[in-house]
Each structure stands twice: as structure tokens, then as C-alpha cells.
Amino acid sequence: MGIVKRENIGFDIRLLTIEEDENYDKAKQRVIIGRTDDFLDEHKTIMYYPFAGSIDTRIKMWVRSTNWRLVSSYYGKKDKAQKAAIVEAFKEGDKRMIIATKAFGMGIDISDIDRVYHVAPSSTFVDYIQEIGRAARDKSIKGIAATDFHERDFYFMKRLHSAGAIT
């Protein structure tokens, strides 16, 4: 593997705090909803989520209904025309956030993505580097790679490794 140096990508890694009246899932939802509200400004964000089957349901949970028009999902089982339309809408700024599996990766070249947020850890370090590399391809942009981390997040990594693939 070669050396990759991207000085225009910073990191925003926060420890997920579980409040007294919450469990892990409620705390994660609370934090993601807050992050989603923050991210739906004039910037472009990719939010990586590891499981394709529930992305569309998660959008309804994480994004206020008044902002649904600004968000799309992207995963392997969408057909080629849908994927192309989503990429074009994101590129043009009609969509400000894509909630995606790692299928939103290779071949996607959008230079003005500001933020990449990981709901859970990527399945491998190489995947993580590739995913955060979507941010700030335009060297004049300061990109942010963000996550809210909890030790329970490793559960997702273990599931991904045991499944052998992400769609």
C-alpha cells in the first residue's frame, strides 16, 4: 500500500455517552439525529451505515420529515438508474446527504463533499480510509471524518466480518 497524505481532512471522533435513562440504541439514535440536523446545512455529507436492509427505515428515524427531500439512500441492491440519479442529485447539490453502505465508494468522484460520518466502524481499516477519502477531494475544502464511538460499536464489525460482505 502506498502513502496517502490528505492534510485537508480533519477528524471529529467523540465518545458516545449513554445517559442514565437510555440504553445504547437510544443513545446512538439521539446522537445521530443531532448530527443529522447539524449536517443538513449547505454542506455535503456521506453517512456510512453498514446494513443496506434498514437504511430507508433509518432515514425516517434520523431525518426530520421537513428534510427528507435533502437525503437519499444508496446501497448495492438499487438499480443502476437509481444509483446514477442519486449520484447526480448529490453532485448538483439537490441532495445534501447520502446515507449509504460501502457501495457508495469506488467510482464515485464528487470533489466538494465536506463530511463523512460513520454510524459504526467500517469492516476494515482499508475500507475506512477509502470511505473518508471521499471527503475534500477539492484541496480548497476542509473535510471532516466524524463518528460517535462506543465500545459496543465493535458488535457491528463482528457482524460484518461474520457475514463476509456488505451490500
Describe every region a protein language model picked out:
Residues 1-36:
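Interdomain hinge/linker at the junction between the two RecA-like core domains of SF2 helicases
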Residues 26-30, 34-104, 108-167:
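C-terminal helicase lobe
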